[in-house]
From Swiss-Prot:
It is an enzyme of class 4 (lyase). Catalyzes the conversion of urocanate to 4-imidazolone-5-propionate. It comes from Symbiobacterium thermophilum (strain DSM 24528 / JCM 14929 / IAM 14863 / T). It catalyses: 4-imidazolone-5-propanoate = trans-urocanate + H2O. This is Urocanate hydratase. Its cofactor is NAD(+). It is found in: Cytoplasm.
Length: 551
């Protein structure tokens, strides 16, 4: 392990590769491992328990070397974080194709994965860790903001003002929660076992305060709720201890969820009664005992969530598979509360809406502020988008290369991409822009306990859709395309695909952008048409998507 090595993406217009498409892949790989961005960069872990950018430092170095020598008509193949081949393809083909953590269905278990990982044959890519498009906590912030906003609309008249949200986990994903709640005018108590993670969110202004005392956290929360003021509190502790204690005291939060790394009971979730350091020792000394204790804690954690739901709280699973883990340990009504996608997000997916993100390769925040203005001018009628961008400018701390995210739908993404390409071509932006997204998107994931939970036609587990998404984006000329397994919810529970396309100001980039930013969100609309959603069919007809079964 190379404890002292620091990786940071180059900035500016000087190329170290043979073209901007390759340079973009190189910089985004390096950006994933920037200490400002990654959770444990010395171990190549970006976020999500054990989501890595490369399999080993040797593999990382080989990827960097390959990208620097890659021609404009060649494609690099990466298998679970290791570069395995370079083939001559053509200029409009992707420069990199990535497959991470994919296992044949019968062997798709954490136990088999860990065995392969120990042998150095595989790595866990999460969603955007192994596909080189993680942008830090902002990457999930707008989705988290939209989720809490929709909960507020459905249950609390449109705002969380004077309301308490209880959640846990301040890692790369969960770290967005406190700011998302305060952006919705609410009060958040976020339980986190790792003090360093709480400190990081304080440093980045995602979190307002920290305490070790539940009494103090509740006192602060009550005071802010009474005044109708937003406040976020990081509470040092274990959710498996704190949640049941809150139930015991008869305190009923308005909203309850969780974003601990419960999807991974070995490398993610920390059992009750252990410090981070003690957990690390037990994990190494007796992994089976560690998993047993983690799962017992998860059962207590979920039982408390069920108790709060019965007492009147709005409770939802925030996509970490915690219900499944508890169910497998014998908690039979673990699925009594819904996942966040069917509860709040699916109507957006029917329009091909999802987390469109972009990164300024110049390293200059001003390039992002210029693109913010361009987006507001492109969609002047979208007031919630304007509100989001204005809030993001004030409150979001850039991690690594400056980046932005906003949810855009079919027809909108292509307009944005072409506008960015024009801005690069004219010199308004100092360097090219990288455009990507989370794998959590409308048409790029099969995950029956998360994105495709409770599909109208029962097609929750059909994994053809993310594969078609990757294939069509490859055909359309994305700069790099990835197919992953297990992201978000753990090995055995999801299949998903990612794409990145670069706006470098050229005519070639314009063609790529026009195709990819149409096919990619188009798959989201099509997937939901096929599942029987009327809204998706209406969108497809209005916007001219060809559907052979409807022609």
């Amino acid at each position: 392990m190379e404890m002292t090595r620091t990786v940071r993406a180059p900035r500016g217009t000087q190329l170290s590769c043979k073209g901007w498409q390759q340079e973009a892949a190189l910089r985004m790989l390096m950006n994933n491992l920037d200490p400002e961005v990654a959770e444990r960069p010395e171990e190549l872990v970006v976020y999500g328990g054990s989501g890595k950018a490369a399999r080993s430092w040797e593999a990382f170095d080989a990827i960097v070397k390959a990208l620097r020598s890659l021609e404009d008509d060649e494609t690099l193949l990466v298998q679970s974080g290791k570069p395995v081949a370079i083939f001559r393809t053509h200029r409009m083909a992707p420069r990199v194709l990535i497959a991470n953590s994919n296992l044949v269905a019968r062997w798709a278990t954490w136990e088999h994965f860990w065995e392969l990982e120990r042998k150095g044959l595989m790595m866990f890519g999460q969603m955007t860790a192994g596909s080189w498009i993680y942008i830090g906590t902002q990457g999930i912030l707008q989705g988290t903001y939209e989720t809490f906003a929709e909960a507020a609309r459905q249950h609390f008249g449109g705002s969380l003002k004077g309301r308490l949200a209880l959640t846990a986990g301040l890692g790369g994903m969960g770290g967005a929660q406190p700011l998302a709640v305060t952006m919705n005018e609410g009060v958040a108590i976020v339980v986190e076992v790792d003090e360093a993670r709480i400190q990081r969110r304080l440093d980045h202004r995602y979190l307002d305060r920290m305490t070790r005392s539940l009494d103090e956290a509740l006192a602060w929360a009550r005071e802010s709720m009474a005044k109708g003021e937003p406040l976020s509190i990081g509470l040092l502790g274990n959710a498996a201890t704190i949640y049941p204690e809150i139930v015991r005291r008869g305190v009923i939060p308005d909203v309850v969820t969780d974003q601990t790394s419960a999807h991974d009971p070995l490398n993610g979730y920390i059992p009750e009664g252990l410090s981070v350091q003690e957990a690390a020792k037990l994990r190494k000394a007796d992994p089976d005992e560690y998993i047993r204790r983690a799962k017992a804690s998860i059962v207590k954690h979920v039982q408390a969530m069920l108790d709060m739901q019965k007492a009147g709280a709005v409770v939802f699973d925030y996509g970490n598979n915690i219900r499944q883990q508890a169910y497998e340990e014998g908690l039979k009504d673990a699925f009594a509360f819904p996942g966040f996608v069917p509860a709040f997000i699916r109507p957006l997916f029917c329009e091909g809406k999802g987390p469109f993100r972009w990164v300024a390769l110049s390293g200059d925040p001003e390039d992002i502020y210029k693109t913010d203005r361009a987006i507001m001018e492109l969609f002047p009628e979208n007031q919630s988008l304007r509100r989001w961008l204005e809030m993001a400018q004030k409150k979001v701390h850039f991690q690594g290369l400056p980046a932005r995210i906003c949810w855009l739908g079919y027809g909108e993404r292509v307009k944005a991409g072409l506008k960015f390409n024009e801005m690069v071509a004219s010199g308004e932006l100092k360097a090219p822009i990288v455009i990507g997204r989370d794998h959590l998107d409308a048409g790029s994931v099969a995950s029956p306990n998360r994105e495709t939970e409770a599909m109208k036609d029962g097609s929750d587990a059909v994994a053809d859709w993310p594969l078609l998404n990757a294939l069509v984006n490859t055909a359309a000329g994305a700069t790099w395309v990835s197919i992953h397994h297990g992201g978000g919810v753990g090995i055995g529970y999801s299949q998903h695909a990612g794409m990145v396309v670069v706006a470098d100001g050229t005519e070639e980039a314009r063609v790529r952008l026009e195709r990819v930013l149409t096919t990619d969100p188009g798959m989201g609309v099509v997937r939901h048409v096929d599942a029987g959603y009327e809204k998706a069919l209406q969108v497809a007809r209005e916007r001219g998507i060809r559907l052979p079964m409807y022609e």
